[in-house]
Every structure is written in C-alpha cells, then in structure tokens.
Amino acid sequence: MKWLIRIVLIVVVLVVVLAVGGILMIDSIATAAVKHGAEFATQTDVELEGIDVKLFSTEGEIKKLDIKNPNGPFRDKFDSFMILGTGTAQISAGSLMSDTIVIPKVELSNIELSLVGLEGKKNYEVILESLKRFQGDNPPKESEGGKKIVIKELIIRNITVNYYFDADPALGAIAMGPKQIVIADDEPMVLTNVGAGGVPMPQITADIITDIMVQVMANLAGDLGGHMKGLANSLVDTLGTDKLGETLKDLNLGDHVKAIGDLGVDLGEGVGDLLKGVGEGTGDVLKGVGGGLKNLLGGKEEEKKEEE
C-alpha cells in the first residue's frame, strides 16, 4: 500500500511539473511570436518584457512592447517609435489548437508614440513603408507560416504623442516641439474584427500600428495642421483609400471632421462620403467649413460677393 501511495504521489508531482513547464513554455512561445511579429512588420529593433499567460484562465498580459525608431537622427531625437505600456487579451480556449486563434477582446493602454520630422524626412514614413508590404493580396511569404489570429474587439486608450518637427515648407508647416499631447484618454478607440478571417502575427501587428496612427492623424489634424497632412498622405499611400475609409468609419471623429477636411488631402471618394455622412449625422457640422473640406467632398467653394 505504501508503494502504491508513493507511486501516486510521484505521478501527481510529475503532472504538476509538466503543467508548470508547459505554461512557462507557452509564455516563452507567445513572447517570441509577438516580438518576431513586431520586428518583421516594422523592420526595426523591438524589445518585449514578456507575455504572461494566466495559469487557469484564457487571459494573457503583454508587458511593455517597445518598437524602436529607425536608426539614425530619428532615434537620437526619440529612442522609441511606439511603446505599448500594458495590454490584456482574452483567448478563446477552443481555438488554441486550431489554425486560427480567435481573441474575443484585446485592450491596449498607456501607449507612447513619437512623430519626428527632420529636414523633410519623417520617422513614420520609414515605418509605414515597411507596413505597406502587408497591404493587398501579396503579403511577404515569410509572414505566412504559423497560426493565424483574429481579434473580435480591439480597445485602445490613453495614447501619448511625443512630437518634434522641423519647419516643412512643402507642407506649409512651421517648426513644432518637442512637445507632448495625450489623446483617446476619455473616449477609447474601439475597432472590431481586426484581422478578419485570420492573419499572421506580423499582419496583426501592422494593422494595429496603422489603426493607432489613423486615430492620431484624426485627433491631431487641428493641433498639428500641415504636419498631419504629411501623415495623412503617408496613410493613403500605405493603406489605400478603401481601407483608410473603413478605419475612419470605426472612429468617433466628432469635432475632428472639419480639421481632417482642412488638411486638403485627397482621401478618396469613399472617405469623402463618410465625412459628409458624419457631418449630416451630427447636426450638419459641415456648414461653414473651409474650402479644404468642400473640395474633399467633391463640392466647389463659392465665394460670396458683397453688393456695394
């Protein structure tokens, strides 16, 4: 009987050791996958403190994902392009063994983003040029392996933007910064069905970064003017007007509609209709808007002449 008890105890200990070892391995695998996905997507250096998968639940915590600025003057100004301070994810347990992992909800907060313009060159142009590889029907073959991911609901809040811009005559923009501004702190950014159908980790990373940058462009169009015109142009080049329109549709544009239009960027017919619809749905906020938004919506600015 004593030998039987000992055997049972040994088996129990082995099961516990294997279970703990498996959890530790899951943490390591998840950390490596997220880090590699961010590095491959942005083609820059990435640091990740780690991912903690809860022992008896399907929740995970992302700890400080740090995407560095491209090497050179941009990194000299701000070391990091984007820092994700905290993130939590709920995972559908039934999908863990399938080819596509379904994540019902991801919440990201305490994000820091740096925007730098030096001598006509922008740090975001370098990053977006890398992310552009994942748009369209022919993403990099290296990103196609492994499991695919879809996020049903993505919530992003508390984005701190650090910026420094030289004067840029081409954009009609004066020198600004270094300064800091916080957005999405009162009303979080909420997106649904990110990575629809399931996409590889690098693609999810690219989608989340561009989503954040669209939010920043929309929120700061009024504050940073011409400098956001440059970002808007880059987003159009990276995403195309259709995908940019889909992202803007999910955002709460509110009072930013006029400022987005005043950038004078050709965001495409679909986005023009979207902004027009937002204006009509919010008490005709487009009345009195300047020529930039009228041109965006396909209209012509009419000058009123005073009769003498």
Label each residue range with its predicted role.
Residues M1-Q43:
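N-terminal type II signal-anchor transmembrane helix
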Residues W3-I5, V13-L24, T58-L65, N110-L118:
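Short low-complexity stretches enriched in small and charged residues
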Residues L4-V11, V15, L220-L231, L235-L293:
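A hydrophobic membrane-anchoring feature enriched in long, contiguous, low-charge segments
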Residues I7, V11, S28, F56-E59, ...:
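Generic alpha-helical scaffold signal
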Residues A32, H36-G37, D45, L96, ...:
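N-terminal "first-domain core" detector
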Residues Q43-P70, R157:
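N-terminal leader/targeting pre-sequences
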Residues K64-N219, T238, V265, E269, ...:
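Secondary-structure transition motifs
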Residues E306-E308:
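Short, solvent-exposed mixed-charge patches
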